């Protein structure tokens, strides 16, 4: 039903810029465009699969830590997801903003606006996380009245607030890079950070050293830290714009002055 509704809206064309006639769906395929789409879609899909599988594995670590820890971990993730909603929205916006600016050749504007979105997300999410952390126990009481579960939730929400300043560099920046067709770099970084940090560090701290669910979350924060460093470096150096080279300024030759 949703797909039919979308096709109907596009065919009617409430926005003339988005009007797509039904005849256009039966035209010959343009494989050059398809390859460009696949160049972004395939790395993004691989990144999503790797992230989901790694997150599932870390949840298996928590599954053997008792019902109170499992419940507290689930509730903390739910609260953290609510806190991160503005950042997720800005991440989606960064893809659109950079893609739109680069599509019309405004390379400098794309770079400036991605930085603005990044800092807006960083400051906003940090403020939200730090303001809501003191009320972690109150928010947990909407889910349960078990004191052990609430204790786990409070610890995890405070840890989440402590590491929130690096969240935007981990997730908003790669979303903006995808708007510049720089999806492969995000894929390789995600593979390295997920399996080299979140899974390994989470297992070592949470299982081998006995830190429990805190160790598993520290593995997640190590994943954030690696992603934040690599993606921030990518933004600062401007290498995420490698498919959009800047035009070289033309050198003006000085004409010799002829004296009369």
Report each predicted region and the residues it spans.
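Short amphipathic alpha-helical segments, especially helix-boundary/capping motifs
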Residues: 33-37, 55-59, 70-75, 112-116, ...
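Short alpha-helical transmembrane segments in multi-pass integral membrane proteins
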Residues: 1-42, 98-163, 205-260
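Generic hydrophobic alpha-helical membrane-segment signal
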Residues: 35, 42, 54, 156, ...
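Hydrophobic alpha-helical transmembrane segments of integral membrane proteins
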Residues: 34-36, 69, 82-86, 92, ...
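C-terminal structured "cap/appendage" subdomains that terminate the fold
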Residues: 173-177, 184-196, 203-218
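Helix-terminus/linker motif at the lipid-water interface of multi-pass membrane proteins
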Residues: 49-82, 100, 138-147, 208
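Small-residue-rich hydrophobic transmembrane alpha-helices
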Residues: 72-136, 167-190
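Hydrophobic alpha-helical transmembrane bundles that constitute the permease/transmembrane domains
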Residues: 1-7, 14, 41, 45-60, ...
């Amino acid at each position: 039903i949703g797909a039919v509704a979308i096709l109907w809206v596009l065919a009617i064309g409430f926005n003339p810029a988005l009007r797509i006639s039904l005849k256009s769906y039966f035209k010959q395929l343009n494989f050059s465009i398809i390859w460009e789409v696949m160049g972004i879609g395939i790395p993004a899909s691989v990144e999503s699969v790797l992230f989901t599988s790694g997150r599932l594995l870390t949840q298996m670590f928590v599954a053997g830590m008792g019902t109170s820890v499992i419940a507290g971990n689930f509730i903390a993730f739910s609260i953290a997801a609510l806190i991160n909603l503005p950042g997720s929205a800005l991440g989606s916006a960064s893809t659109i903003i950079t893609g739109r600016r680069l599509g019309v050749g405004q390379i400098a504007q794309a770079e400036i606006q991605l930085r603005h979105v990044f800092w807006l997300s960083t400051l906003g999410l940090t403020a939200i996380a730090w303001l809501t952390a003191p009320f972690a126990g109150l928010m947990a009481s909407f889910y349960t009245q078990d004191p052990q579960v609430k204790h786990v939730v409070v610890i995890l929400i405070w840890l989440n607030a402590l590491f929130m300043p690096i969240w935007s560099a981990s997730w908003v920046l790669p979303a903006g890079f995808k708007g510049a067709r720089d999806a492969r770099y995000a894929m390789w970084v995600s593979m390295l950070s997920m399996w080299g940090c979140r899974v390994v560090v989470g297992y070592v701290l949470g299982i081998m050293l006995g830190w429990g669910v805190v160790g598993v979350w520290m593995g997640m924060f190590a994943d954030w830290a690696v992603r934040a460093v690599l993606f921030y470096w990518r933004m600062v150096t401007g290498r995420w714009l490698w498919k959009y080279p800047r035009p070289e300024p033309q050198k003006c030759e000085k004409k010799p002055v002829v004296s009369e």
